[in-house]
């Protein structure tokens, strides 16, 4: 696959699934974090009530988890809480296919970070290392540059290995035999479901079956079971 080709999927009302989502930019999210660190103020203007900001930072539930380098001992109003590099931190991450977002800040240190990247396989790990380096620099952490060099080199090595593994997986999927009981032309058409809507199957010039379901599209491949296909 050509990784330079943009992913066709974009967030729309039809694909704003799971817990939902939002569209924003790095500058706007940075302004949002400035408000978090300034009791709702951005510059001299009170953008959000200070009482709301303080309440949103208060832990509402206890948790006992971790995401990469980030401890999660509680959950506030949309913010995970925990200690990071010896300081209290609030953070929330998110993502979509081909994209990963990172928002975090240290209220006591007055430091915040926004990282948006469009890498698919290692996006979360990449932003994790950027955060390690950025906070390390901001806090004057000894040896952070050498540590970052080592971690980024390991990530680059892992990326090459994952790329090769992805190629092997795609080749294995393409090699699966088709076990359809009818000619492929028989499966082309429109399929309607009361809850799932319409799925369109089209026989293409290369004899492959293209599947479209609303905003989603893919090319089917063979599957192990009779009269089944794989659609990803």
Model regions: which residues?
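Extended acidic/charged loop-beta regions that coordinate divalent cations
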Residues: 1
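Catalytic loop of the DD-peptidase/beta-lactamase superfamily, centered on the K-T-G motif
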Residues: 4-232
């Amino acid at each position: 696959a050509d990784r330079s080709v943009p992913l066709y999927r974009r967030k729309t009302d039809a694909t704003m699934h799971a817990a939902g989502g939002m569209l924003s930019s790095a500058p706007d999210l940075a302004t949002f974090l400035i408000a978090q660190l300034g009791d709702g103020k951005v510059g001299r203007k009170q953008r959000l009530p200070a009482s709301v900001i303080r309440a949103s930072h208060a832990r509402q539930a206890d948790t006992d988890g971790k995401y990469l380098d980030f401890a999660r001992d509680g959950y506030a109003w949309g913010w995970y809480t925990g200690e990071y590099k010896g300081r209290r931190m609030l953070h929330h991450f998110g993502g979509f296919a081909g994209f990963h977002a990172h928002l975090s800040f240290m209220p006591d240190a007055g430091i915040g970070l926004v990282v948006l990247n469009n890498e698919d396989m290692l996006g979360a790990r990449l932003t994790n290392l950027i955060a390690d380096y950025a906070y390390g620099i901001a806090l004057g952490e000894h040896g952070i540059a050498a540590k970052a060099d080592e971690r980024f080199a390991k990530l680059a090595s892992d990326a090459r290995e994952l790329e090769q593994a992805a190629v092997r997986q795609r080749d294995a999927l393409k090699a699966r035999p088709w076990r359809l009981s009818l000619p492929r032309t028989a499966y082309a058409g429109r399929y309607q479901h009361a809850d799932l809507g319409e799925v369109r199957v089209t026989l293409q010039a290369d004899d492959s079956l293209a599947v479209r379901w609303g905003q989603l599209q893919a090319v089917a491949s063979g599957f192990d079971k009779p009269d089944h296909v794989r659609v990803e």
